[in-house]
Protein backbone atom coordinates (compact mmCIF):
# COMPACT_ATOMS: atom_id res chain seq x y z
CA UNK A 1 0.00 0.00 0.00
CA UNK A 2 1.31 3.51 -0.89
CA UNK A 3 1.46 6.35 1.63
CA UNK A 4 -1.63 7.86 -0.04
CA UNK A 5 -4.75 6.51 1.66
CA UNK A 6 -7.63 5.53 -0.58
CA UNK A 7 -10.80 6.58 1.24
CA UNK A 8 -14.40 5.80 0.34
CA UNK A 9 -16.61 8.36 2.10
CA UNK A 10 -20.34 8.00 2.70
CA UNK A 11 -21.60 11.11 0.93
CA UNK A 12 -25.31 10.41 1.41
CA UNK A 13 -25.70 13.27 3.97
CA UNK A 14 -24.68 15.72 1.22
CA UNK A 15 -27.96 15.12 -0.61
CA UNK A 16 -30.98 17.24 0.32
CA UNK A 17 -31.12 20.05 2.89
CA UNK A 18 -28.01 19.95 5.04
CA UNK A 19 -28.32 20.12 8.78
CA UNK A 20 -25.63 19.02 11.24
CA UNK A 21 -24.41 15.74 9.73
CA UNK A 22 -24.61 17.12 6.19
CA UNK A 23 -22.54 20.17 7.09
CA UNK A 24 -19.97 17.96 8.82
CA UNK A 25 -19.71 15.65 5.81
CA UNK A 26 -19.45 18.57 3.39
CA UNK A 27 -16.68 20.35 5.30
CA UNK A 28 -14.78 17.10 5.88
CA UNK A 29 -14.98 16.20 2.18
CA UNK A 30 -13.66 19.64 1.18
CA UNK A 31 -10.67 19.32 3.49
CA UNK A 32 -9.88 15.70 2.61
CA UNK A 33 -9.98 16.56 -1.10
CA UNK A 34 -7.25 19.16 -0.54
CA UNK A 35 -4.90 16.81 1.33
CA UNK A 36 -2.14 15.16 -0.69
CA UNK A 37 -2.08 12.06 1.51
CA UNK A 38 -5.72 11.19 0.77
CA UNK A 39 -7.30 9.85 -2.41
CA UNK A 40 -11.01 10.30 -1.70
CA UNK A 41 -14.06 8.92 -3.44
CA UNK A 42 -17.67 9.18 -2.29
CA UNK A 43 -20.68 6.90 -2.42
CA UNK A 44 -24.37 7.60 -1.87
CA UNK A 45 -26.53 4.89 -0.34
CA UNK A 46 -29.64 5.71 -2.31
CA UNK A 47 -31.13 4.21 -5.43
CA UNK A 48 -32.47 7.53 -6.68
CA UNK A 49 -30.83 10.91 -6.90
CA UNK A 50 -27.28 9.78 -6.23
CA UNK A 51 -26.02 11.52 -9.39
CA UNK A 52 -26.61 14.83 -7.61
CA UNK A 53 -23.64 13.86 -5.44
CA UNK A 54 -21.29 14.83 -8.26
CA UNK A 55 -22.56 18.41 -8.11
CA UNK A 56 -21.99 18.90 -4.39
CA UNK A 57 -18.62 17.20 -3.95
CA UNK A 58 -15.27 19.01 -4.29
CA UNK A 59 -14.24 19.43 -7.93
CA UNK A 60 -12.81 16.27 -9.42
CA UNK A 61 -14.00 13.93 -6.65
CA UNK A 62 -15.26 10.64 -8.04
CA UNK A 63 -18.61 9.31 -6.86
CA UNK A 64 -21.14 6.58 -7.44
CA UNK A 65 -24.44 5.32 -6.14
CA UNK A 66 -25.78 1.92 -5.18
CA UNK A 67 -27.98 -0.22 -7.44
CA UNK A 68 -30.22 -1.15 -4.50
CA UNK A 69 -32.31 0.90 -2.08
CA UNK A 70 -30.92 2.10 1.24
CA UNK A 71 -33.77 0.37 3.07
CA UNK A 72 -32.86 -3.00 1.54
CA UNK A 73 -29.16 -2.50 2.25
CA UNK A 74 -29.87 -1.72 5.89
CA UNK A 75 -32.01 -4.83 6.25
CA UNK A 76 -29.24 -6.93 4.76
CA UNK A 77 -26.50 -5.37 6.90
CA UNK A 78 -28.59 -5.86 10.01
CA UNK A 79 -28.54 -9.61 9.43
CA UNK A 80 -25.05 -10.19 8.03
CA UNK A 81 -21.98 -8.34 6.68
CA UNK A 82 -23.28 -8.69 3.13
CA UNK A 83 -23.21 -7.26 0.54
CA UNK A 84 -19.73 -5.80 1.11
CA UNK A 85 -19.07 -2.28 -0.12
CA UNK A 86 -16.37 -3.47 -2.53
CA UNK A 87 -19.05 -5.28 -4.55
CA UNK A 88 -20.48 -1.91 -5.60
CA UNK A 89 -17.65 0.59 -5.21
CA UNK A 90 -14.46 -1.38 -5.82
CA UNK A 91 -11.48 -1.74 -3.53
CA UNK A 92 -10.37 0.95 -1.12
CA UNK A 93 -8.10 1.18 1.91
CA UNK A 94 -10.65 2.77 4.25
CA UNK A 95 -14.42 3.05 4.16
CA UNK A 96 -15.77 5.88 6.33
CA UNK A 97 -19.37 5.76 7.51
CA UNK A 98 -20.05 9.45 8.18
CA UNK A 99 -23.62 9.01 9.38
CA UNK A 100 -23.85 6.36 12.13
CA UNK A 101 -23.83 3.31 9.80
CA UNK A 102 -20.69 1.56 8.52
CA UNK A 103 -21.01 -0.57 5.38
CA UNK A 104 -19.40 -4.00 5.73
CA UNK A 105 -16.20 -4.59 3.76
CA UNK A 106 -14.08 -7.57 2.77
CA UNK A 107 -10.68 -5.91 2.99
CA UNK A 108 -11.13 -2.22 3.74
CA UNK A 109 -10.61 -0.90 7.26
CA UNK A 110 -13.75 0.64 8.70
CA UNK A 111 -14.02 4.07 10.34
CA UNK A 112 -17.38 5.13 11.76
CA UNK A 113 -18.57 8.54 12.93
CA UNK A 114 -21.15 8.46 15.73
CA UNK A 115 -22.51 11.97 16.30
CA UNK A 116 -24.57 11.15 19.39
CA UNK A 117 -26.51 8.27 20.94
CA UNK A 118 -29.67 10.15 21.91
CA UNK A 119 -31.82 7.55 20.15
CA UNK A 120 -30.82 4.88 22.67
CA UNK A 121 -32.78 6.70 25.37
CA UNK A 122 -35.54 8.00 23.09
CA UNK A 123 -36.18 5.38 20.38
CA UNK A 124 -39.66 6.82 19.91
CA UNK A 125 -38.08 9.87 18.27
CA UNK A 126 -36.92 7.75 15.33
CA UNK A 127 -38.89 7.67 12.10
CA UNK A 128 -40.06 4.43 10.44
CA UNK A 129 -36.97 4.30 8.19
CA UNK A 130 -34.69 4.46 11.25
CA UNK A 131 -36.46 1.93 13.47
CA UNK A 132 -33.48 -0.44 13.23
CA UNK A 133 -30.88 2.31 13.71
CA UNK A 134 -29.89 1.35 17.29
CA UNK A 135 -29.04 -2.20 16.21
CA UNK A 136 -27.28 -0.99 13.06
CA UNK A 137 -25.15 1.49 15.00
CA UNK A 138 -24.18 -1.17 17.53
CA UNK A 139 -23.21 -3.57 14.70
CA UNK A 140 -21.32 -0.81 12.93
CA UNK A 141 -19.37 0.18 16.04
CA UNK A 142 -18.42 -3.44 16.63
CA UNK A 143 -17.30 -3.81 13.00
CA UNK A 144 -15.31 -0.55 12.89
CA UNK A 145 -11.58 -0.43 13.49
CA UNK A 146 -11.98 3.15 14.76
CA UNK A 147 -14.99 5.14 15.96
CA UNK A 148 -14.90 8.94 15.62
CA UNK A 149 -17.01 11.18 17.87
CA UNK A 150 -17.36 14.98 17.88
CA UNK A 151 -16.80 15.36 21.62
CA UNK A 152 -15.29 13.50 24.54
CA UNK A 153 -18.80 13.48 26.02
CA UNK A 154 -20.05 11.34 23.14
CA UNK A 155 -16.90 9.20 23.28
CA UNK A 156 -17.63 8.40 26.93
CA UNK A 157 -21.20 7.37 26.07
CA UNK A 158 -20.00 5.19 23.17
CA UNK A 159 -17.61 3.39 25.50
CA UNK A 160 -20.27 2.97 28.19
CA UNK A 161 -23.35 2.12 26.12
CA UNK A 162 -21.84 0.26 23.16
CA UNK A 163 -18.97 -1.31 25.14
CA UNK A 164 -16.48 0.02 22.61
CA UNK A 165 -12.83 -0.18 23.79
CA UNK A 166 -11.59 3.33 24.68
CA UNK A 167 -8.48 2.97 22.54
CA UNK A 168 -10.72 2.44 19.52
CA UNK A 169 -12.40 5.86 19.89
CA UNK A 170 -10.94 9.12 18.54
CA UNK A 171 -12.48 12.54 19.20
CA UNK A 172 -12.65 14.64 16.02
CA UNK A 173 -14.28 17.98 16.99
CA UNK A 174 -16.18 19.87 14.32
CA UNK A 175 -15.02 23.20 12.92
CA UNK A 176 -16.23 26.75 12.33
CA UNK A 177 -16.07 28.08 8.78
CA UNK A 178 -13.98 31.30 8.61
CA UNK A 179 -16.94 33.12 7.02
CA UNK A 180 -18.68 33.15 10.42
CA UNK A 181 -16.09 35.54 11.84
CA UNK A 182 -17.00 38.23 9.31
CA UNK A 183 -20.76 37.63 9.26
CA UNK A 184 -22.93 40.74 9.35
CA UNK A 185 -26.58 41.22 10.43
CA UNK A 186 -29.21 40.77 7.73
CA UNK A 187 -29.84 43.50 5.19
CA UNK A 188 -33.22 45.20 5.09
CA UNK A 189 -34.07 43.16 1.99
CA UNK A 190 -33.31 39.89 3.79
CA UNK A 191 -35.21 40.99 6.91
CA UNK A 192 -38.23 41.77 4.79
CA UNK A 193 -38.02 38.51 2.82
CA UNK A 194 -37.78 36.39 5.97
CA UNK A 195 -40.10 38.51 8.11
CA UNK A 196 -37.45 39.17 10.74
CA UNK A 197 -38.20 41.68 13.51
CA UNK A 198 -35.66 44.32 14.47
CA UNK A 199 -34.69 42.36 17.60
CA UNK A 200 -35.08 38.61 17.99
CA UNK A 201 -33.97 35.52 19.84
CA UNK A 202 -32.86 32.68 17.57
CA UNK A 203 -32.99 28.90 17.51
CA UNK A 204 -31.09 27.12 14.72
CA UNK A 205 -31.83 23.50 13.86
CA UNK A 206 -34.37 21.08 12.49
CA UNK A 207 -37.61 20.53 14.37
CA UNK A 208 -37.79 17.41 16.53
CA UNK A 209 -38.46 16.22 20.09
CA UNK A 210 -34.75 16.17 20.98
CA UNK A 211 -34.50 19.93 20.49
CA UNK A 212 -37.04 20.54 23.31
CA UNK A 213 -38.68 23.53 21.68
CA UNK A 214 -41.71 23.06 23.93
CA UNK A 215 -39.51 24.05 26.89
CA UNK A 216 -38.22 27.08 24.99
CA UNK A 217 -41.73 28.16 24.00
CA UNK A 218 -42.94 27.90 27.61
CA UNK A 219 -40.04 30.01 28.86
CA UNK A 220 -40.59 32.53 26.09
CA UNK A 221 -44.33 32.80 26.79
CA UNK A 222 -43.70 33.15 30.53
CA UNK A 223 -41.34 36.08 29.93
CA UNK A 224 -43.36 38.59 27.86
CA UNK A 225 -40.60 41.22 27.84
CA UNK A 226 -38.42 39.01 25.63
CA UNK A 227 -38.22 39.86 21.91
CA UNK A 228 -39.83 37.54 19.34
CA UNK A 229 -38.41 34.07 18.84
CA UNK A 230 -37.20 33.04 15.37
CA UNK A 231 -36.86 29.35 14.45
CA UNK A 232 -34.39 28.78 11.60
CA UNK A 233 -34.37 25.29 10.10
CA UNK A 234 -36.57 22.71 8.40
CA UNK A 235 -39.78 21.30 9.84
CA UNK A 236 -41.01 24.19 11.97
CA UNK A 237 -44.69 25.12 11.83
CA UNK A 238 -45.70 28.64 10.92
CA UNK A 239 -45.83 30.83 14.00
CA UNK A 240 -47.34 34.17 14.99
CA UNK A 241 -45.97 37.59 15.88
CA UNK A 242 -44.14 36.16 18.90
CA UNK A 243 -42.74 33.02 17.24
CA UNK A 244 -41.65 33.06 13.61
CA UNK A 245 -40.18 30.43 11.30
CA UNK A 246 -37.79 31.00 8.40
CA UNK A 247 -37.62 27.41 7.15
CA UNK A 248 -34.33 26.00 5.90
CA UNK A 249 -31.75 28.70 5.10
CA UNK A 250 -28.74 28.51 2.77
CA UNK A 251 -25.42 29.15 4.52
CA UNK A 252 -25.03 32.76 3.42
CA UNK A 253 -28.49 33.71 4.76
CA UNK A 254 -28.04 31.65 7.92
CA UNK A 255 -24.84 33.48 8.81
CA UNK A 256 -26.58 36.83 8.52
CA UNK A 257 -29.60 35.70 10.54
CA UNK A 258 -27.34 34.40 13.33
CA UNK A 259 -25.18 37.54 13.30
CA UNK A 260 -28.29 39.69 13.71
CA UNK A 261 -29.73 37.79 16.67
CA UNK A 262 -29.89 39.28 20.15
CA UNK A 263 -28.99 35.82 21.46
CA UNK A 264 -28.92 32.24 20.22
CA UNK A 265 -30.63 29.58 22.32
CA UNK A 266 -30.16 25.81 22.08
CA UNK A 267 -32.55 24.11 24.55
CA UNK A 268 -31.77 20.53 23.49
CA UNK A 269 -32.49 17.48 25.60
CA UNK A 270 -29.35 15.88 24.15
CA UNK A 271 -26.52 17.08 21.90
CA UNK A 272 -23.42 15.48 20.46
CA UNK A 273 -21.71 18.76 19.63
CA UNK A 274 -24.02 21.74 19.01
CA UNK A 275 -22.32 23.51 16.11
CA UNK A 276 -24.69 26.53 16.13
CA UNK A 277 -23.40 27.63 19.54
CA UNK A 278 -19.83 27.92 18.25
CA UNK A 279 -20.95 29.70 15.10
CA UNK A 280 -22.87 32.21 17.22
CA UNK A 281 -19.82 32.84 19.41
CA UNK A 282 -17.77 33.43 16.24
CA UNK A 283 -20.01 36.35 15.24
CA UNK A 284 -20.34 37.95 18.69
CA UNK A 285 -23.78 36.60 19.58
CA UNK A 286 -24.49 35.57 23.22
CA UNK A 287 -25.40 31.91 23.70
CA UNK A 288 -27.88 30.32 26.11
CA UNK A 289 -28.07 26.52 26.07
CA UNK A 290 -28.91 23.42 28.07
CA UNK A 291 -26.41 22.31 30.67
CA UNK A 292 -25.34 19.11 28.91
CA UNK A 293 -21.89 17.43 28.92
CA UNK A 294 -21.26 18.03 25.20
CA UNK A 295 -22.37 21.67 25.34
CA UNK A 296 -20.27 22.35 28.43
CA UNK A 297 -17.31 20.88 26.56
CA UNK A 298 -17.88 22.80 23.34
CA UNK A 299 -18.75 26.21 24.79
CA UNK A 300 -15.82 26.17 27.21
CA UNK A 301 -17.33 28.62 29.69
CA UNK A 302 -18.45 31.14 27.05
CA UNK A 303 -22.20 30.43 27.21
CA UNK A 304 -24.94 30.61 29.82
CA UNK A 305 -25.86 27.04 30.77
CA UNK A 306 -29.36 26.26 32.05
CA UNK A 307 -30.61 23.10 33.82
CA UNK A 308 -32.68 21.21 31.28
CA UNK A 309 -36.42 21.70 31.68
CA UNK A 310 -36.26 24.62 34.14
CA UNK A 311 -38.67 27.14 32.57
CA UNK A 312 -37.97 29.95 35.03
CA UNK A 313 -34.19 29.55 34.73
CA UNK A 314 -34.32 29.60 30.93
CA UNK A 315 -36.41 32.77 30.90
CA UNK A 316 -34.02 34.43 33.34
CA UNK A 317 -30.99 33.37 31.30
CA UNK A 318 -32.47 34.82 28.11
CA UNK A 319 -33.31 38.06 29.91
CA UNK A 320 -29.77 38.21 31.27
CA UNK A 321 -28.24 37.65 27.84
CA UNK A 322 -30.02 40.78 26.60
CA UNK A 323 -29.38 42.92 29.68
CA UNK A 324 -26.16 44.63 28.63
CA UNK A 325 -23.70 44.46 25.73
CA UNK A 326 -20.65 42.27 26.34
CA UNK A 327 -17.31 43.90 27.04
CA UNK A 328 -14.63 43.93 24.31
CA UNK A 329 -12.69 41.38 26.34
CA UNK A 330 -15.70 39.04 26.44
CA UNK A 331 -16.24 39.35 22.69
CA UNK A 332 -12.56 38.67 22.02
CA UNK A 333 -12.58 35.63 24.30
CA UNK A 334 -15.65 34.19 22.56
CA UNK A 335 -14.12 34.63 19.12
CA UNK A 336 -10.77 33.21 20.20
CA UNK A 337 -12.50 30.15 21.61
CA UNK A 338 -14.54 29.60 18.44
CA UNK A 339 -11.46 30.05 16.25
CA UNK A 340 -9.76 27.08 17.94
CA UNK A 341 -12.25 24.79 16.15
CA UNK A 342 -11.25 24.40 12.49
CA UNK A 343 -12.35 21.97 9.80
CA UNK A 344 -8.69 21.45 8.88
CA UNK A 345 -8.09 20.10 12.37
CA UNK A 346 -11.17 17.89 11.98
CA UNK A 347 -9.70 16.45 8.79
CA UNK A 348 -6.23 15.97 10.28
CA UNK A 349 -7.65 14.04 13.23
CA UNK A 350 -9.81 12.01 10.85
CA UNK A 351 -6.77 11.08 8.75
CA UNK A 352 -5.08 10.02 11.99
CA UNK A 353 -8.11 7.78 12.57
CA UNK A 354 -7.66 6.30 9.08
CA UNK A 355 -4.01 5.54 9.79
CA UNK A 356 -4.88 3.94 13.12
CA UNK A 357 -7.53 1.81 11.40
CA UNK A 358 -4.93 0.61 8.89
CA UNK A 359 -2.23 -0.09 11.49
Located regions from the model:
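Carbohydrate transferase catalytic cores enriched for Leloir-type hexosyltransferases
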Residues: 1-359
